[in-house]
């Protein structure tokens, strides 16, 4: 799989422009772009980590090179976005957490989202068996603590299932259930965004069934507490909650 993804990276015009511009600066692709390439999906939002150079300066310089719009998304966490002229492609640029690539990757949500690719050395960095999960079509988290630190990830697990159709282990559903009360901590806008992504997937029913098992569904949409009380009737073999999900 990795050789096929390498070929996609090397044939991607924008990625190669970034590589050429970076020259001797260590720059890594990370997260969604690699996952999407593995899944054969288009990607218009590329995340890159800049090592040993200030991400803000790099982002400003790259914006000039690409004639892109520079947006400081989060100055505190040093996250900067470039919007390309086509208004379709985006580049998010940051430095690694605590100046450590390993610490940055280990704080991400899913193992399949924690694969990095070193543009200068042309090699993958897969510390958490992300490629294995992609091959096995499994969704696994890096750590339980990461869910507690950012509770939106409790919902993102199922958003990615809706998009990929990958399986979620029962133990992971139990872990999510233990922390379900945290899901309302993130801003409503962030929750709504994840729900929109979930409902746009090809495997929404599968994801909703597990979202219900985890208890998250009733936490974010309390109306389903009443829906679950309605039993099957002569017109449908499932309770109302099952019928609603179908």
Locations of regions flagged by a protein language model:
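Catalytic cores of the polymerase beta-like nucleotidyltransferase superfamily
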Residues: 1-246
């Amino acid at each position: 799989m990795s050789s096929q993804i390498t070929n996609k990276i090397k044939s991607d015009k924008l990625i190669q422009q970034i590589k050429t511009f970076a020259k001797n600066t260590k720059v890594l692709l990370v997260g969604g772009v690699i996952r999407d390439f593995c899944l054969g999906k288009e990607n218009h939002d590329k995340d890159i980590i800049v090592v040993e150079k200030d991400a803000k300066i790099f982002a400003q310089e790259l914006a000039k090179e690409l004639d892109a719009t520079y947006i400081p998304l989060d100055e505190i966490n040093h996250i900067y976005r470039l919007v390309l002229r086509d208004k379709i492609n985006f580049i998010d640029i940051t430095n690694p957490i605590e100046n450590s690539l390993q610490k940055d990757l280990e704080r991400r949500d899913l193992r399949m989202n924690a694969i990095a690719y070193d543009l200068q050395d042309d090699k993958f960095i897969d510390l958490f068996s992300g490629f294995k999960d992609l091959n096995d079509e499994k969704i696994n988290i890096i750590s339980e603590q990461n869910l507690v630190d950012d509770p939106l990830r409790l919902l993102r697990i199922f958003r990615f299932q809706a998009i990929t159709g990958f399986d979620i282990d029962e133990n992971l559903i139990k872990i999510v259930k233990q922390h379900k009360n945290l899901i309302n901590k993130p801003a409503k806008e962030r929750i709504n965004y994840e729900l929109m992504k979930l409902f746009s997937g090809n495997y929404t029913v599968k994801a909703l069934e597990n979202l219900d098992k985890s208890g998250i569904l009733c936490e974010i949409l309390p109306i389903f507490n009443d829906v679950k009380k309605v039993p099957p009737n002569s017109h449908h073999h499932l309770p109302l909650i099952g019928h609603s999900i179908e």
